[in-house]
């Protein structure tokens, strides 16, 4: 078979598969995020960020990352995969690089991936998220100190305050608490014993 013809056929097949994924609506039974009014305590400031779409989009309760200001299921049929970095042909790093791409609107930060399924926060209350976050069985075996480090220094977490622009050139929404205030709140909450208030 002619190599050029084979190349054209494979390209057409790939484009067709991408079109099918892009135009297939994925239905999910995942519950919506439970929101409530923010108060002025360190816990509430921290949770206002952790329950914001910039965090929840990558902490889904199913195998589909979310995207956009409306937190819709990721385009192109992207799925979690065994290592939380997508499946063979649709790895996170195929599109998401180490920084935002202002030409395409694709967001990026180092170590772009979904949180492990044990760290699913979608549909949980703030109290449930905090309990999960402090439970070594759910948080990857982290101590409180390691959890604070992750929440306040990890580049992917801090990306939330530099989320770039979307494909239409519109700025993405940042969390409702400024970064410095959030970091202080996380550290203050931990220093006070990481107490979780009653619901």
Regions found by a protein language model. Give the residues of each.
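Short N-terminal amphipathic alpha-helix/helix-capping patch enriched in small hydrophobics
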Residues: 42, 51-54
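N-terminal export/targeting leaders of redox proteins
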Residues: 1-47, 67, 78-83, 101-199
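N-terminal, post-signal-peptide region of Sec/Tat-exported proteins
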Residues: 55-85
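Processing junctions and N-termini across compartments
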Residues: 49, 86-89
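The canonical Cys-X-X-Cys-His
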Residues: 53-62, 89-99, 186
